Swiss-Prot record:
Keywords: Acetylation, Actin-binding, Calcium, Cell junction, Cell membrane, Cell projection, Cytoplasm, Cytoskeleton, Membrane, Metal-binding, Phosphoprotein, Repeat. InterPro entries: Actinin_actin-bd_CS (IPR001589), CH_dom (IPR001715), CH_dom_sf (IPR036872), EF-hand-dom_pair (IPR011992), EF-hand_Ca_insen (IPR014837), EF_Hand_1_Ca_BS (IPR018247), EF_hand_dom (IPR002048), Spectrin/alpha-actinin (IPR018159). GO terms for biological process: actin filament bundle assembly; actin filament network formation; cortical cytoskeleton organization; focal adhesion assembly; platelet formation. This is Alpha-actinin-1. The modification Phosphotyrosine is found at residue 12. It comes from Mus musculus (Mouse). Residues 274-733 are annotated as: Interaction with DDN. Homodimer; antiparallel. Interacts with MYOZ2, TTID and LPP. Interacts with DDN. Interacts with PSD. Interacts with MICALL2. Interacts with DNM2 and CTTN. Interacts with PDLIM1. Interacts with PDLIM2. Interacts with PDLIM4 (via PDZ domain). Interacts with IGSF8. Belongs to the alpha-actinin family. Residues 31-135, 144-250 form the Calponin-homology (CH) domain. The gene is Actn1. Spectrin repeats lie at residues 274-384, 394-499, 509-620, 630-733.
Length: 892
């Protein structure tokens, strides 16, 4: 294992020296340490918004290592180097190692170079040193600390659990019960420990790790399979994991004890305050009840009715049975609460409770005595008054009962008889009202006897000098007057119902005839309005002529329709005449139809208004179709000429690009003259665009006079211009390539002939197989063996860098020119600079300005990096990196 030491002599550091160094090379242990240490680091790095994926790679530049130390220590380290060179990385790692050493840890055999080189052994050893110093060293249980302290803490916390015997930090944790016991000891609601089995370590470990990650914010540092599948789990990995549990739970017990002490004191104080509040409220409520009750008991004013006196007796009995006993209990409870409160205050060293003024126990006892005195004699007075009223109450009750029954029956009867519902009723409703009225007349006759009995009882009460005789007489007189009025209203309503029935029978016949004729006429008008307002969409003159003929036929039917309208309105006018003559209030409508005369007239007027609008619309559409036809013919005539012309030119360009002869300059001259002839044709295209704009504005979507549309013409024209421009550009590039690479005209012709030979589809490009055949024809030895395939793949990456699957002629020429001509290289440019620099490894600004033109000298000075070699002088520039950057071998 890694070598590290501390200035302190803590025992937890000593056993590490004796561990077998070869154990780290065990793949299972290394895997466990990688996962555990990575998770431990990420649990701290996430506080800074970052993490690591590969522990030996992500710490190589020292940046995240310094950030980790800042997070776990809470201190700032020296400013890191931001460069990407090895010297910068070593500097950053050394800063981190110096910080660890400043905390009293002696690092043995751990150097910055090994960390920067990604040495797994040294990196894991360094992280373990950090874990020991910042996560385990400060653990202290009784007289032990660090590793022994952590082990003792685990043993004490897991002691009550069966099947758990923690003796070390490797095999004692393999069955997973130790982790589960730690969680259950501190958070029993998270794990059902009784359901765990010692023979199922995978489930136990996964349960503990998942619960710790979800609820305790402890990341998963190991896989259960790695622990179970290893004879002796890695001790450092287990210690790291267990230390996370220690830090998660260490503060819980102290906080719980302090919270319990505070809660106990507060509970006693709150209980005493609640007892004080209860006493004050109970005393206040009881005194208020006594204050309200005494005046009620002292009130001896007699009542005039038996019911009122019985109610007083019942209220008094309710008071004795329901209201007073709870108050007696409250009074007793008040004294008990007072004594209990004083005892609790005395036992808890609190001052004695002093109730508010007037709420002492003695005050309550005095008020209670006054209440008892007021009760005396009240019940006997009540019984004597009841006997006195009992003699008159029976007869008065009989009068009230009969009067109430009669009044309940007559309630609403006058309003019902005064109703004029027959004025707005239909014929069927009138007949129903007559039947209902006959039933009411029978009921009215049956109530005559009760009215006579009410009058007799009222006379008897007057003779017996009843105290409430005036109200009895008034009620009796009201009943008699109402009875006479009901008789008169009944006769008047019968006459009105019979008269209305006859009028409605006549009106009903007229309504029926109106409905039979109005419905079909209304349907005809609605159909006519729909047809007249229908938005027609036509594209030819023939279609608009058909619509015009149909419209003329419709106008010929309007006179007969107007006669039918007048006949229907005549029926409605007859109904109105009857209503006005006999003053019938026609609140209802025609039961056979919802069509009104106003609706008929409104729709008829609308039809008359729509007819001339339809005439105008048809006339305008006819003129528009004639104009559209002229536009179609005009566009078709031009398109039928331009379309074939573009197609012919495209075919000619294709032949020219394949069959070009003579020198490249002759070909270029010929193509430019050809391009000029094409560009001169542009005014005709513009004129066609103007005609197309007119067609679009007229919303013309088809044209039988041509098969070409403007989109086809535009695409063809753009393709024509693009094709001629691309062909010219290819020839220009060929000239540039020829001049730059020294290719002869004969070689260029040979390349063109070979390319055209294998371009069998005349697309101007070669596929991979066509290109391969072309190279073979030119003498390249490309076999079908793996070496030949690799060579061909290299060539394809040159000629088709974007991996489009095709090779253009220009790419073909570029490749062939590189293969057949001399080219300058970065080494050649570098050698040239070295000559200018006097055989030095650097060059100065003065030398550049002396040897090169001014603009090119300034270009080099602005882009050359400072030279950093051991033989550097002030102002020295690095021409070597500049030369490689020119050819894409490094960044400029």
């Amino acid at each position: 294992m890694d070598h590290y030491d501390s200035q302190q002599t803590n025992d937890y550091m000593q056993p590490e020296e004796d561990w077998d160094r070869d154990l780290l090379l065990d793949p299972a242990w290394e895997k466990q340490q990688r996962k555990t240490f990575t998770a431990w680091c990420n649990s701290h790095l996430r506080k800074a918004g970052t993490q690591i994926e590969n522990i030996e790679e992500d710490f190589r530049d020292g940046l995240k290592l310094m950030l980790l130390l800042e997070v776990i220590s809470g201190e700032r380290l020296a400013k890191p180097e931001r460069g990407k060179m090895r010297v910068h990385k070593i500097s950053n790692v050394n800063k981190a190692l110096d910080f660890i050493a400043s905390k009293g840890v002696k690092l043995v055999s751990i150097g910055a170079e090994e960390i920067v080189d990604g040495n797994v052994k040294m990196t894991l050893g360094m992280i373990w040193t950090i874990i020991l110093r910042f996560a385990i060293q400060d653990i202290s249980v009784e007289e032990t600390s660090a590793k022994e302290g952590l082990l003792l803490w685990c043993q004490r916390k897991t002691a009550p659990y069966k099947n758990v015997n923690i003796q070390n930090f490797h095999i004692s944790w393999k069955d997973g019960l130790g982790f589960c016991a730690l969680i259950h000891r501190h958070r029993p609601e998270l794990i059902d420990y009784g359901k765990l089995r010692k023979d199922d370590p995978l489930t136990n470990l996964n349960t503990a790790f998942d619960v710790a990650e979800r609820f305790l914010d402890i990341p998963k540092m190991l896989d259960a399979e790695d622990i179970v599948g290893t004879a002796r789990p890695d001790e450092k990995a287990i210690m790291t994991y267990v230390s996370s549990f220690y830090h998660a739970f260490s503060g819980a017990q102290k906080a719980e004890t302090a919270a319990n002490r505070i809660c106990k004191v507060l509970a006693v104080n709150q209980e005493n305050e609640q007892l004080m509040e209860d006493y004050e409220k109970l005393a206040s409520d009881l005194l208020e009840w006594i204050r309200r009750t005494i005046p009620w008991l002292e009130n001896r004013v007699p009542e005039n009715t038996m019911h009122a006196m019985q109610q007083k007796l019942e209220d008094f009995r309710d008071y004795r049975r329901l209201h007073k006993p709870p108050k007696v209990q409250e009074k007793c409870q008040l004294e008990i609460n007072f004594n209990t409160l004083q005892t609790k205050l005395r036992l808890s060293n609190r001052p004695a409770f002093m109730p508010s003024e007037g709420r002492m126990v003695s005050d309550i006892n005095n008020a209670w005595g006054c209440l008892e005195q007021a009760e005396k004699g009240y019940e006997e007075w009540l019984l004597n008054e009841i006997r006195r009223l009992e003699r008159l109450d029976h007869l008065a009750e009989k009068f009230r009962q009969k009067a109430s029954i009669h009044e309940a029956w007559t309630d609403g009867k006058e309003a019902m008889l005064r109703q004029k519902d027959y004025e707005t009723a239909t014929l069927s409703e009138i007949k129903a009202l007559l039947k209902k009225h006959e039933a009411f007349e029978s009921d009215l006759a049956a109530h005559q006897d009760r009215v006579e009995q009410i009058a007799a009882i009222a006379q008897e009460l007057n003779e017996l000098d009843y105290y409430d005789s005036p109200s009895v007489n008034a009620r009796c007189q009201k009943i008699c007057d109402q009875w006479d009025n009901l008789g008169a209203l009944t006769q008047k309503r019968r006459e009105a119902l019979e008269r209305t029935e006859k009028l409605l029978e006549t009106i009903d016949q007229l309504y029926l005839e109106y409905a039979k004729r109005a419905a079909p006429f209304n349907n005809w008008m609605e159909g006519a309005m729909e047809d007249l307002q229908d938005t027609f969409i036509v594209h030819t003159i023939e279609e608009i002529q058909g619509l015009t003929t149909a419209h003329e036929q419709f106008k010929a039917t309007l006179p007969d329709a107007d006669k039918e309208r007048l006949a229907i309105l005549g029926i409605h006018n007859e109904v109105s005449k009857i209503v006005q003559t006999y003053h019938v209030n026609m609140a209802g409508t025609n039961p056979y139809t919802t069509i009104t005369p106003q609706e008929i007239n409104g729709k008829w007027d609308h039809v008359r208004q729509l007819v001339p609008r339809r005439d105008q619309a048809l006339t305008e559409e006819h003129a528009r179709q004639q104009h559209n036809e002229r536009l179609r013919k005009q566009f078709g005539a031009q398109a039928n000429v331009i379309g074939p012309w573009i197609q012919t030119k495209m075919e000619e360009i294709g032949r020219i690009s394949i069959e070009m002869h003579g020198t490249l300059e002759d070909q270029l001259s010929h193509l430019r003259q050809y391009e000029k002839s094409i560009v001169n044709y542009k005014p005709k295209i513009d004129q066609l665009e103007c005609d197309h704009q007119l067609i679009q504005e007229a919303l013309i979507f088809d044209n039988k006079h041509t098969n070409y549309n403007m989109e086809h013409i535009r695409v063809g024209w753009e393709q024509l211009l693009t094709t001629i421009a691309r062909t010219i550009n290819e020839v220009e590039n060929q000239i540039l390539t020829r001049d730059a690479k020294g290719i002869s005209q004969e070689q260029m012709n040979e390349f063109r002939a070979s390319f055209n030979h294998f371009d069998r589809d005349h697309s101007g490009t070669l596929g991979p197989e066509e290109f391969k055949a072309c190279l073979i024809s030119l003498g390249y030895d490309i076999g079908n063996d793996p070496q030949g395939e690799a060579e061909f793949a290299r060539i394809m990456s040159i000629v088709d860098p974007n991996r489009l699957g095709v090779v253009t002629f220009q790419a073909f020429i570029d490749f062939m020119s590189r293969e057949t001509a001399d080219t300058d290289t970065a080494d050649q440019v570098m050698a040239s600079f070295k000559i200018l620099a006097g055989d030095k490894n650097y060059i100065t600004e003065d030398e550049l300005r002396r040897e090169l033109p001014p603009d090119q000298a300034e270009y080099c000075i602005a882009r050359m990096a400072p030279y950093a070699g051991p033989d550097s002088v002030p102002g020295a520039l690095d021409y070597m990196s500049f030369s490689t950057a020119l050819y894409g071998e490094s960044d400029l």
